[in-house]
Amino acid sequence: EGTAQSSAESQGKIDFKTKLIRVSEKLSLNLKENENTLLDKQLMSALPKIIEQLIAHKEQETMGKITSNLVDNLFSENAEVRAHAAKALTDIINSLSPERKTEMIESLSGRLIEWIKIETSVTPAYKTVCNYLQNIAQNFINHLHYTETIPVLDIFNDVNSGKLEKNDAIHEVCAQIIRNLATEENITLLFKEFNTNEHDKKDEAGIILSMFGDITLKRMLDTLQENVDGNERVRIMHLIIGTGQRAIPF
């Protein structure tokens, strides 16, 4: 009797997994072929649970297809579809464990940056995605991964500096991200690398400092006054010019 029960339970798990995969693949196909799928509130509310089960059953490939098709919909011409895709994606990411969450955000960061470039509306999901990118940028800075930090900061810097024209609401979100990252701790860490080249990342540290704009300008000017080496002064002046500020009399 025990063996029969165990066999029935095993069969039940197999049946559930088969059904889960079938439903998930159908959902993935619908997301790919019909963007209006995103407007089905009941279905979208169940999406994080579906992803949770896919993770539990180690169905990474199927989960990847769903998230990839969601990201594709971030680039729809329909603003409502983009908003729903962003919400569905952030609902999924927020349901993950911290480690898996970071992993997914880093893997999607390139496409999320592209979306930030084209998006025209600030929604709660838009702010959430910006916060995701801020967090991975901070994580990169903490681990001295300055090369990886630059493309993440670049989009926020482009909006903050006006190089990429956006409405006031988007500009404020991006400006806040820059302010949040331009902490005294980060600036000190970056200036240390810029001044010493201890980790052979002086140029990258300089680029990041220039993206912080006028927040780091005073520190740059102080460094310029203190530094007597001609080549170093030229490097710092180039860094100051890189902030996009008006010419300053030296």
Regions found by a protein language model. Name each.
Residues F75, S95, G110, E114-I118, ...:
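Short alpha-helical interface elements
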Residues E1-N186:
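Extended amphipathic alpha-helical repeat scaffolds
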Residues N73, I155-G162, L189-N197, I208, ...:
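Alpha-solenoid HEAT/Armadillo-like helical repeat scaffolds in large eukaryotic proteins
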Residues K65, E103-S107, I207, I215, ...:
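Short sequence/structural elements of tandem HEAT/ARM alpha-solenoid repeats
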Residues E52, A56, F75, N94, ...:
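Alpha-solenoid HEAT/Armadillo repeat architecture
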Residues M44-L47, V129-L133, L164-H171, E184-E185, ...:
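Generic helix N-cap/helix-start motif at coil->alpha-helix transitions
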Residues P48, A86, L153, A175, ...:
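Hydrophobic core positions within HEAT/HEAT-like alpha-solenoid repeats
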